[in-house]
From Swiss-Prot:
One of its GO terms (molecular function) is ATP binding. Belongs to the ATPase alpha/beta chains family. ATP binds at residues 169-176. Pfam families: ATP-synt_ab, ATP-synt_ab_C, ATP-synt_ab_N. The keyword Repeat does not apply. This is ATP synthase subunit alpha. HAMAP family: ATP_synth_alpha_bact (MF_01346). It is a peripheral membrane protein. It is found in: Cell inner membrane. PROSITE patterns: ATPASE_ALPHA_BETA (PS00152). InterPro entries: ATP_synth_asu-like_sf, ATP_synth_asu_C, ATP_synth_asu_C_sf, ATP_synth_F1_a_nt-bd_dom, ATP_synth_F1_asu, ATPase_a/bsu_AS, ATPase_F1/V1/A1_a/bsu_N, ATPase_F1/V1/A1_a/bsu_N_sf. It is an enzyme of class 7 (translocase). It comes from the Bacteria.
Length: 512
């Protein structure tokens, strides 16, 4: 049978007209080797660093290294089913995670999947895990206070919205306790109608036991703090890749609030374990080790994360993201590699000492080493005036107490200085889960620096403090509102405080 050229032409033309464009064009590569969560893949020469790849088993991976003939992929999660020869497909996208108010009250894993049994998210906003930090022109100076509810911090080491403040100390010194107290303190702002005062919290648990995080979540639920908090969990049993991703996921969730004219607080607990997870990945990728076997870019690992915390300017909506990274030290050695790195990145550090903790001073804050570089600008004038006097009194007390150790005879003024310093130190002690509103902190410290506790026994200081605040709440709530509204201690407020405190001290003396 002889076909005519015109018939062949018509048949081909008809076939081409019926042919749709390729609905999906995918680049496929193959696994050459797999081990310890690292897959070497051949055939994806166009893949880019940070791209998400899809394995034929359904598992995902991130491109970490690009080499001449192959790429190295870090498997997200368990790669048990991936074998040599398994197909790998490009997705041409970077990792995105769900964000938004829908995540409040939920517990998610390192890539944003819910793990609390409350079902999937309905309509979340997906954001990139890795984004550039806001530029200098988008930022504003830190000028709003981030109230922690902890007297020693709000007075001596103040934190502002958009700041990065490191919490550092040995294990079991109360680092997580401080972070949780700060979350609990935000509850009073969420009960008010002022949206600008509300702070949404993200707690990122890296390399912790699931049982520990479960207790923490239970506490947040009991106190009602879970309503404005999201917990991102990458436990000790998770793969190093998930522990590496968890802080960036938490940061992306916080950035949703920052970029939508709201305030967010993200706590990274802790970045020591995050650095260890990254070290593990880097050594498996055969990257050259540097100091303490960490890779050379470990500084960039944390700087690109913490630089995303910012206070945005008016043109960008005045939102903020505050970061509180936690770092665990060994034997109070702050000169180790990771602690020094993060100290140099952050805007200050809260240093907790095990010696103070064992003495019963909680929070076990070393005021001498702790510092806040930008938070003082955010302090209200009332607290700033009180805090300057407290710092001076405490500095003189520590100096005089050290001098008294030599057994020298002290005059009456020096003894008075030591006695007042002891009472001020006692005033700064605080139980866990008991955050103080700023107006109550101001009243307590005002009483301390003006000598109203000088005749009170040190063991009775906490009792005096509780009774005094109760007296103010019942008989003089207006003075508290006045302090909050004016944000400073005027002569009128000062005279009122003196009058009320004198009446209270007199009533105590009469009772005793």
């Amino acid at each position: 049978m002889q076909l005519k050229a015109s018939e062949v032409y018509e048949a081909l033309k008809q076939q081409l007209e019926d042919f749709d464009e390729l609905s999906e064009l995918s680049e496929v590569g193959y696994v050459i080797s797999i081990g310890d969560g690292i897959a070497k893949v051949y055939g994806l020469s166009n893949a880019y660093s940070g791209e998400i790849l899809q394995f034929s088993t359904g598992t995902k991976g991130i491109v970490f290294s690009l080499k001449d003939n192959l790429i190295e992929v870090v498997v997200i999660g368990s790669g048990d089913q991936i074998k040599q020869g398994s197909q790998v497909k490009r997705t041409q996208t970077s990792l995105k995670v769900p964000t938004g108010k829908e995540l409040l009250g939920r517990v998610v894993d390192a890539i944003g999947n819910p793990i609390d049994g409350k079902g999937e998210f309905i309509n979340p906003t997906y954001l990139d895990v890795e984004v550039k930090a806001p530029s200098v022109m988008c930022r504003d100076s830190v000028n709003e206070p981030m109230y922690t509810g902890i007297k020693a911090i709000d007075a001596l080491i103040p934190i502002g919205k958009g700041q990065r403040e490191l919490i550092i100390g040995d294990r079991q010194t109360g680092k997580t306790a401080i972070a949780i107290d700060i979350i609990l303190n935000q509850k009073r702002f969420h009960l008010s109608d002022q949206e600008k005062e509300k702070v949404y919290c993200i707690y990122v648990a890296i390399g912790q036991k699931r049982s520990t995080v479960a207790q923490l979540v239970k506490k947040l639920q009991e106190t009602g703090a879970m309503a404005y908090t999201t917990v991102v969990l990458s436990s000790a049993s998770d793969a190093a890749s998930l522990q590496y991703l968890a802080p960036y996921t938490g940061c992306a969730i916080g950035e949703y609030f920052r970029d939508n004219c709201m305030h967010a607080l993200v706590i990274y607990d802790d970045l020591s374990k995050h650095a260890i997870a990254y070290r593990q990945i880097s050594l498996l990728l055969r990257r050259p080790p540097a100091r303490e076997a960490y890779p050379g870019d470990v500084f960039y690992l944390h700087s690109r994360l913490l630089e995303r915390a910012a206070k945005l300017n008016k043109a960008k909506g005045e939102g903020s993201l505050t970061a509180l990274p936690i770092v665990e030290t060994q034997n109070s050695d702050v000169s180790a590699y990771i602690p020094t790195n993060i100290i140099s990145i952050t805007d200050g550090q809260i240093f907790l000492e095990s010696e103070l903790f064992y003495k019963g001073i909680k929070p076990a804050l070393n005021v001498g080493i702790s510092v806040s570089r930008v938070g003082a600008a955010a302090q209200i004038k009332a607290m700033k005036d009180i805090a300057s006097s407290v710092k001076l009194e405490l500095a003189q007390y520590h100096e005089m107490e050290a001098f008294s150790q030599f057994g020298a005879d002290l005059d009456s003024s020096s003894m008075q200085l030591i006695n007042r310093g002891r009472r001020l130190s006692e005033l700064l002690k605080q139980s866990q889960y008991c955050p103080f509103p700023v107006e109550e902190q101001i009243i307590v410290l005002f009483a301390g620096i003006n000598g109203y506790l000088d005749k009170i026994a040190v063991s009775k200081v906490k009792e005096f403090e509780n009774n005094m605040l109760e007296y103010f709440r019942i008989h003089n709530p207006d003075i508290m509102n006045e302090i909050i509204n004016t944000k400073k201690i005027t002569e009128i407020i000062s005279s009122k405080l003196h009058q009320i405190l004198q009446e209270f001290v007199k009533s105590i003396e009469q009772c005793s």
